[in-house]
């Protein structure tokens, strides 16, 4: 009887140790998962700030682009500005809209740092980030085509390269495209980060 009691006690002790070990393993795994999700959320916040800077610079640079050329007399001048081209106007409007969205999404990104296991809000961000990525890609690509025509023209369509006269204007409208394409890359990274954070849950 005493032997059976000893065996029973030993078995119960072993079961208790196994349960505690399993519990510690679960807690440890949960802690590591939470730390990884929090790190992804911090990276998300930093990338959103970077995207805001890139988009704002692009919109401001494009929106303030103009050049005036004197023609024969000081009273007759040729002027070129971004609003003369509807595609570049759309570029400024779209970049402004994306900037507003990114600024509004920053508080939600901060919430994800505090509550790393939030999932519904991450799904919303993935959807909206994807929409903004598509918008930026569309306007940046269309604007790049217009800038190319401004530099090279199209002989078959009788479109002349205006950059031969408005060289400063063309330099100014080329620069914002770099920031816009950089913002595209950042938005793509944001979508991937949110997807990775959801996959770790």
Curated annotation (Swiss-Prot):
Cytoplasmic side: 1-41, 109-122, 194-201
Similarity comment text for this entry: Belongs to the Casparian strip membrane proteins (CASP) family.
Sugar attachment sites: 66
Entry keyword set: Cell membrane, Cell wall biogenesis/degradation, Glycoprotein, Membrane, Transmembrane, Transmembrane helix
Function (record text): Regulates membrane-cell wall junctions and localized cell wall deposition. Required for establishment of the Casparian strip membrane domain (CSD) and the subsequent formation of Casparian strips, a cell wall modification of the root endodermis that determines an apoplastic barrier between the intraorganismal apoplasm and the extraorganismal apoplasm and prevents lateral diffusion.
Source lineage: Eukaryota, Viridiplantae, Streptophyta, Embryophyta, Tracheophyta
Extracellular side: 63-87, 144-172
InterPro entries: CASP/CASPL, CASP_dom, CASPL
Protein name in the entry: Casparian strip membrane protein 4
Major localization listed first in the record, in broad terms: membrane
One Gene Ontology cellular component: plasma membrane
Positions of region (Disordered): 1-23
UniProt subunit comment: Homodimer and heterodimers.
């Amino acid at each position: 009887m005493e032997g059976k009691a000893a065996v029973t006690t030993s078995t119960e002790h072993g079961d208790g140790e196994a349960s505690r070990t399993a519990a510690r393993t679960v807690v440890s795994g949960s802690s590591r998962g939470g730390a990884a999700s929090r790190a992804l959320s911090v990276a998300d916040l930093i990338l959103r700030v970077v995207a805001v800077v890139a988009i704002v610079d692009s919109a401001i640079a494009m929106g303030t682009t103009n050049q005036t050329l004197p023609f024969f007399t000081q009273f007759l001048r040729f002027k070129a500005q971004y609003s003369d081209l509807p595609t570049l106007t759309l570029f400024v409007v779209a970049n402004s809209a994306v900037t507003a969205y990114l600024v509004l999404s920053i508080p939600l990104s901060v919430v994800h740092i505090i509550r790393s296991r939030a999932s519904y809000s991450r799904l919303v961000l993935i959807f909206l980030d994807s929409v903004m990525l598509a918008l930026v890609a569309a306007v940046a690509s269309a604007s790049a085509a217009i800038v190319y025509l401004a530099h090279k023209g199209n002989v078959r369509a009788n479109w002349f390269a205006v950059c031969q006269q408005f060289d400063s204007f063309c330099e100014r409208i080329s620069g914002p495209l770099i920031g816009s394409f950089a913002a595209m890359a950042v938005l793509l990274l944001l979508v991937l980060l949110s997807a990775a954070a959801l996959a770790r849950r």
